[in-house]
Amino acid sequence: MSFKDLRSFIDHLEANGELKRISYPVDPYLEMTEIADRVLRSGGPALLFENPKDNTMPVLVNLFGTPKRVAMALGKEDPLALREVGELLAFLKEPEPPTGFKDALAKLPKFKQALNMPPKSVSHAPCQQVVITGDEVDLTALPIQHCWPGDVAPLVTWGLTITKGPRQKRQNLGIYRQQLLGKNKLIMRWLDHRGGALDFKDFKELHPGERYPVVVALGSDPVTILAAVTPVPDSMSEYAFAGLLRGERTEVCKAISCDLEVPATSEIILEGYIDPNEMAEEGPYGDHTGYYNETDSFPVFTVTHITKRKDAIYHSTYTGRPPDEPAMLGVALNEVFVPILRKQYPEIIDFYLPPEGCSYRMAVISIRKQYPGHAKRVMMGAWSFLRQFMYTKFIIVVDEDVNCRDWQDVIWAITTRMDPTRDTTLIDHTPIDYLDFASPVAGLGSKMGLDATNKWPGETQREWGTPIVMDPNVKQKVDEIWQDLGIDSHPTL
């Protein structure tokens, strides 16, 4: 099942008990965050606040608050099915020509999917049913959440920022938080390595001093939103990848004020520009780390037009100490990364980003070890292969007999298969998340790799221990007689 717009997905969630409508007047200032946080931590539904205090526009939160809802957005019921998305990405990142007729037939479905990539342009779009321009533009009229007591101002969180570089054929979609600065101004907090910032940098080099067109889409269809947070190849537009996931082309329309294309069924579109000479101090804000981050200077986005659907819905979220919505997205997208990594490193059995590690700061990888030093090779590969992992501070590598998603198993491997001096790899002066205040310099810090695998000859001079394993025949017999033993519980080991 695919969803053409956010509203059809809301209907689907509600029909399946995954969305709750709230008629009570809840304040976007702090109250929505507290309610959403409690519901998310209990594994509860998405929430639609139908009557936000002092506003008539409904607010949708916790849309992707469980891995199950992320899978549902892509027409799947089980998050493990998202590995199919990873397999598609692995194919796109490193396509191999067919080796013969049978191989060509096997790859035909993926080639057919590729035909759905180009977006479809439409002339009459729901997102442009209402047009607001000039002095009528007023961002303060939107029910923008003020998430935490120490936040400096309300914050736009789920906007898809659409940019295009002068050297790029594709448009880029990225999600960057935006501080409300005035009735027609937001601060665009994009870091230097992100797609939007790179497009802006290229534009400034070729067009010094000129205004840079930018569009932000709020409340797009769920597949396009998820495409914007998925590691698509640099040469591919997120619109194209959304078409692949959906099985039909993404509908877009031309913005009113510039040539950028926007998701046609979005709830709200903010159009405008960035003046390269206008910067503002952004923050502090509570972030996904569970702390307030430092302030810094970022470009100002001036909004010249607001277009929207009739009876538009404002899509929002909050970020805080895990679990939060980004952490739940990370748990689901974890399944996307597994096939991509396996394509490059077939020895990888599984890959896990613990949500309590802020989604990406720690990774645990299980491998089928084949030679001395193998664990270190996998560490280096994970840090360098996908830019999503260049901010991962800690990587733990374990053997295939260890469940990398089970902390009891992982801690057992660390404490029994590691020597701290021999098996710890420290690398200094590496890229680190700008929000990581634990690093000595902003954006630059160290990484640690832990080799918790069994050691091979050449890695140790000791006789290595053999794990204790019960005779499988005995286990089977005990399973058969368990109900006759009069023991209530039946643990499986």
From Swiss-Prot:
Q: What is its main location?
A: membrane
The protein's required cofactors = prenylated FMN; Mn(2+)
Q: Pfam families in the record, alphabetically?
A: UbiD, UbiD_C, UbiD_N
Catalysis: reaction(s): a 4-hydroxy-3-(all-trans-polyprenyl)benzoate + H(+) = a 2-(all-trans-polyprenyl)phenol + CO2
Keywords, sorted A to Z: Cell membrane, Decarboxylase, Flavoprotein, FMN, Lyase, Manganese, Membrane, Metal-binding, Ubiquinone biosynthesis
Ligand binding (prenylated FMN):
175-177, 189-191, 194-195
Does the record bear Transcription in its keywords? no
Give, as in the UniProt entry, the pathway in which the protein acts: Cofactor biosynthesis; ubiquinone biosynthesis
State the annotated membrane topology for this chain: Peripheral membrane protein
Residue positions annotated to bind Mn(2+) are: 172, 238
- Subunit structure comment from the entry: Homohexamer.
Gene3D superfamilies this protein is in?
Answer: Single helix bin, UbiD C-terminal domain-like
What is the annotated localization of this protein? Cell membrane
List GO BP terms, alphabetically: ubiquinone biosynthetic process
Class of the enzyme per the UniProt entry, highest EC level: lyase
Q: Which GO terms describe its molecular function?
A: 3-octaprenyl-4-hydroxybenzoate carboxy-lyase activity; metal ion binding
To which species is this protein native? Shewanella denitrificans (strain OS217 / ATCC BAA-1090 / DSM 15013)
Enzyme Commission code(s) on record: 4.1.1.98
Q: What is this protein called?
A: 3-octaprenyl-4-hydroxybenzoate carboxy-lyase
Q: Which InterPro entries match?
A: UbiD, UbiD-like_C, UbiD-like_N, UbiD_bacteria, UbiD_Rift_dom
Q: Which GO terms describe its cellular component?
A: cytosol; plasma membrane
For this chain, the family text in UniProt reads: Belongs to the UbiD family.
Q: What does this protein do?
A: Catalyzes the decarboxylation of 3-octaprenyl-4-hydroxy benzoate to 2-octaprenylphenol, an intermediate step in ubiquinone biosynthesis.
> Which residues participate directly in catalysis?
287 (proton donor)
